[in-house]
């Protein structure tokens, strides 16, 4: 009886911890000798990331916005997606994202998309306003007449929490500027 009570309490505790971690907004901010980045994990597929890169070679003034998608689908022609513009919806608005990389990963593939290259300050302000308006940042890979999303992606939608966007971008920006100061 005592053992089952212990396990019951343990599983309730573990469940509560799991729920709190599920709702956590996990940012990673790092740099190497050439760039810095801020990256947040997805809410639907945790391994999918939304990332913002700043390069020392651009004086840390431009930001490259990317997102990655893991797919279990393994069509033989998945590499033909490289450099193609794929239709997406960002909070319901139809856009395209450019495929930058396709790599085998675990039991499928990880596909890296670019949303573009933007001035850091203006784009950060735009994203904050955009996120505050909708309280959502959701990307869905969609079909068009030349592209069937389900052929390549088993999970076509993900979203990211961006409540800590500004502080995370500022931290990555500071790291990038430290790289500039350490120029030889």
Where does each model-flagged region fall?
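A generic "folded-domain core" signal
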Residues: 23-184
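Classical Sec-dependent N-terminal signal peptides that target proteins to the secretory pathway
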Residues: 1-25
């Amino acid at each position: 009886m005592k053992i089952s009570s212990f396990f019951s309490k343990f599983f309730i505790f573990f469940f509560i911890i799991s729920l709190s971690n599920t709702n956590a907004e996990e940012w990673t901010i790092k740099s190497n000798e050439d760039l810095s980045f801020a990256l947040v994990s997805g809410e639907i597929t945790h391994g999918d990331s939304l990332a913002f890169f700043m390069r020392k070679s651009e004086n840390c003034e431009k930001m490259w916005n990317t997102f990655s998608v893991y797919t279990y689908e393994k069509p033989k022609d998945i590499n033909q997606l490289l450099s193609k513009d794929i239709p997406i919806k960002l909070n319901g608005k139809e856009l395209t994202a450019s495929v930058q990389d396709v790599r085998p990963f675990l039991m499928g593939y990880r596909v890296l998309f670019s949303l573009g290259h933007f001035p850091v300050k203006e784009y950060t302000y735009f994203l904050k306003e955009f996120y505050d308006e909708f309280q959502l940042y959701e990307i869905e890979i969609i079909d068009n007449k030349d592209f069937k999303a389900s052929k390549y992606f088993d999970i076509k939608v993900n979203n990211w929490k961006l409540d800590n966007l500004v502080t995370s971008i500022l931290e990555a920006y500071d790291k990038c500027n430290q790289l500039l100061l350490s120029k030889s």
